[in-house]
Amino acid sequence: MACAGLLTVCLLRPPAPQPQPQTPRHPQLAPDPGPAGHTLFQDVFRRADKNDDGKLSFEEFQNYFADGVLSLGELQELFSGIDGHLTDNLETEKLCDYFSEHLGVYRPVLAALESLNRAVLAAMDATKLEYERASKVDQFVTRFLLRETVSQLQALQSSLEGASDTLEAQAHGWRSDAESVEAQSRLCGSRRAGRRALRSVSRSSTWSPGSSDTGRSSEAEMQWRLQVNRLQELIDQLECKVRAVGPGPHKGGPSWYPPEPGPCWRPGPHSVPSQAPRLEPLREEDLAKGPDLHILMAQRQVQVAEEGLQDFHRALRCYVDFTGAQSHCLHVSAQKMLDGASFTLYEFWQDEASWRRHQQSPGSKAFQRILIDHLRAPDTLTTVFFPASWWIMNNN
């Protein structure tokens, strides 16, 4: 009877569902990162886009790409050609597409850079998690591998910088042969991406900027420095008098930076006590003797983002020390506004050629890279020429 009941239950049970044939699943592919260099360009042009609106105005385009070779008209023509709609807003994606179409032999280079960037970030994350728990031998191996990786990358960077500097020097040479020298005032900004630290300049003991710099001031250069420092003292006196007779300090007014002697203030080795120097009158014959008797003064005004002030201070001190040590730099000083985030940098050079060589030096390029990362607005660069006779003073 029990067996009959069990048989009845088995017959009444609904049939078990038949297994459905499995459809083969294709492995999910990683999202396409886009053409080689596209990710890199996006990061580069994002820093050039100060408004973070995904577009570059011509002013932002000029600030980032001006290299002293292409004229303003040529830059405008390039901007309009990429834009295609004759607007003043160029989408960064269009800019990425434009450069992606012109990569040529650098296509595999940029693709390798993007892969290298991902690999380095992954290795750094793993090192951060595993290094402290690793044995001493494993820690030693990690330090060795990291040090050798840095060495190999620095060797590649040196080769690339050498080629870049050579091409830029040639381009500036061709441009100077075709154009006359004239005073100019323009907005200027860094034109390259990268975050190379200024310490790479200070660690180089064999590099000397400019092929004609000897590193030792001649007697004539010492006289130049003496005259420039005297003029600087005269300017200081005049500014003090203006502040004394004018209204009291107000927000946004100037104050000398730094207020005490420090690495960022370079009065020069030939400063003399103030003796109320006077300027000699201009003589017409001095103007007819050519550009050799003209001094160039470069004024750079910057507005630093609050979160980048500390890094900017360090970079500014390094740059002022580096610039003041150049044999053709007559004087360099920095001024800080009372708002704490605005600065004016003054550089006096013996001639324009020396200043332009300095602009192409590793120290100057490193400082410009710091600027593009930490400024809240494009910096303003103004250059003015002074006849040499204006700087001749006497103490009688």
Swiss-Prot record:
Residue spans with biased composition (Polar residues)?
Answer: 206-217
Region: Required for interaction with APBA3, residue numbers: 181-190
- Please give the tissue specificity annotation from the record for this chain: Strongly expressed in heart and skeletal muscle, moderately in brain and pancreas.
Q: Which GO terms describe its cellular component?
A: cytoplasm; endoplasmic reticulum; endoplasmic reticulum membrane; Golgi apparatus; Golgi cis cisterna; nucleus
Do the record's keywords include Metal-binding?
yes
GO MF term list: calcium ion binding
Query: Which stretches does UniProt call biased (Pro residues)?
Result: 14-34
Identify the keywords attached in UniProt to this record, alphabetized: Calcium, Golgi apparatus, Metal-binding, Phosphoprotein
Question: What sequence ranges are listed for the domain ABM?
Answer: 296-385
In terms of SUPFAM superfamilies, this protein maps to: Dimeric alpha+beta barrel (SSF54909), EF-hand (SSF47473)
Record PTM: Phosphorylated by NEK2.
The Gene Ontology biological process terms listed for this entry are: protein metabolic process; protein secretion; regulation of amyloid precursor protein biosynthetic process
Query: Coiled-coil ranges per the record?
Result: none
What InterPro entries does UniProt report for this protein, alphabetically? Answer: ABM_dom (IPR007138), Dimeric_a/b-barrel (IPR011008), EF-hand-dom_pair (IPR011992), EF_Hand_1_Ca_BS (IPR018247), EF_hand_dom (IPR002048), NECAB1/2/3 (IPR039862)
Record region (Disordered): 14-36, 197-220
Q: Does the keyword Membrane apply?
A: no
**EF-hand domain location, by residue?**
36-71
Major localization class: Golgi
Task: List residues binding Ca(2+).
Answer: D49, N51, D53, K55, E60
Q: Where in the cell is it found?
A: Golgi apparatus
In terms of PANTHER family, this protein maps to: EF-HAND DOMAIN-CONTAINING PROTEIN, N-TERMINAL EF-HAND CALCIUM-BINDING PROTEIN 3
| Function according to Swiss-Prot or TrEMBL | Inhibits the interaction of APBA2 with amyloid-beta precursor protein (APP), and hence allows formation of amyloid-beta. May enhance the activity of HIF1A and thus promote glycolysis under normoxic conditions; the function requires its ABM domain and may implicate the stabilization of the interaction between HIF1AN and APBA3.
Summarize subunit and interaction data from the UniProt record for this chain: Interacts with the N-terminal domain of APBA2. Interacts with NEK2. Interacts with APBA3; APBA3 seems to mediate the interaction between NECAB3 and HIF1AN.
Q: What is this protein called?
A: N-terminal EF-hand calcium-binding protein 3
Which organism is the protein's source? Homo sapiens (Human)
